[in-house]
Amino acid sequence: GNDGNEYKIITQVFLYKFLNDKFGYELKNAKSDIAKKLTGDVKWETAYENLSGDERMLIQSAISPDVPMLEPYHLIANLWNQQSKGDFDTIFDSTMTDIAEKNADIFSTQTTANTRIPLFEALTPFVTDTAQRAPFARALVDKLVNFSFEEAFAQNYDFFSSIFEYLIKDYNTAGGGKYAEYYTPHAIA
């Protein structure tokens, strides 16, 4: 554990889930008459998919520019519905990279040499055994679909603190406490 690939997978998958849920939360709370269509008996993802293209553009313009824009095919619910496809690993990776590309102007970082680092990248190539890539992607989506961060948005909860603690625990032990020495663990804070 705790290699660079594990770090990328954990942070990107949790960030994807966070952004998916944040996007839904913002849509449902948007100051727009269209938002009412997303809070009924139908799941918001289905209602969002059923909006016309113009309605989707209008409601997207009503939410904060601090939230990446997602299309219906980017949503976790859409991935969940495609799990039985044999090339699910490709579908998963394409979804991640498409979100990154469509939001690159705002949600990417740059190196000192002006190279853009995307929000997401293909994750299944980190699985060495190609036959295990689709099952790996299915397992990730299985974990993501059954919980929601929406309650955390109203409470301003820092969910990344637990992930950060997991990632640095071995470094602090094996490295003599030099990494993240100024970080206060969530349990103490």
Question: What does each of the following model-derived ranges do?
Answer:
Residues 1-188:
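Non-catalytic, mostly N-terminal accessory regions of nucleic-acid modification and defense proteins
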